Amino acid sequence: MIQVQTMLKVADNTGAKKVMCIKVLGGSKRKYANIGDVIVASVKDATPGGVVKKGDVVRCVIVRSKRGIRRPDGSYIRFDENAAVLIREDKNPRGTRIFGPVARELRDKEYMKILSLAPEVL
């Protein structure tokens, strides 16, 4: 469950290391985001020479969440950390690599490029 002020790890090679959620997209009263949801975030920590720098405002999709998500068969999938991937307006990732596993629920939200780059889909 991601809300405003939540810090997330960045799971791609854009140069950002940590981002902080500043808005959950999808309605004026929406408070929380989970796996597959899009947020607006500010880059809080970045590596030198990366695509993005500290202070940039970016769009991200949540790929891992400590809260987890319930599947139709009744099982739950949850992760050890909150992680996001920086995306463009057309839902494609800004980076060329994805680090760590991602949830299968991204397929329902049509993030096929992220799924194809990910080393493991759970």
Curated annotation (Swiss-Prot):
Residue stretches in coiled coil: none
Gene3D superfamilies linked to this entry: Ribosomal protein L14
Protein name per its UniProtKB record: Large ribosomal subunit protein uL14
Family: Belongs to the universal ribosomal protein uL14 family.
Job description of the protein: Binds to 23S rRNA. Forms part of two intersubunit bridges in the 70S ribosome.
Keyword annotations: Ribonucleoprotein, Ribosomal protein, RNA-binding, rRNA-binding
Complex and partners: Part of the 50S ribosomal subunit. Forms a cluster with proteins L3 and L19. In the 70S ribosome, L14 and L19 interact and together make contacts with the 16S rRNA in bridges B5 and B8.
Pfam families: Ribosomal_L14 (PF00238)
Molecular function (Gene Ontology), one example: large ribosomal subunit rRNA binding
Organism: Acetivibrio thermocellus (strain ATCC 27405 / DSM 1237 / JCM 9322 / NBRC 103400 / NCIMB 10682 / NRRL B-4536 / VPI 7372)
SUPFAM superfamilies given in the database record: Ribosomal protein L14
Source species, domain of life: Bacteria
GO BP of this protein: translation
GO CC, any one term: cytosolic large ribosomal subunit
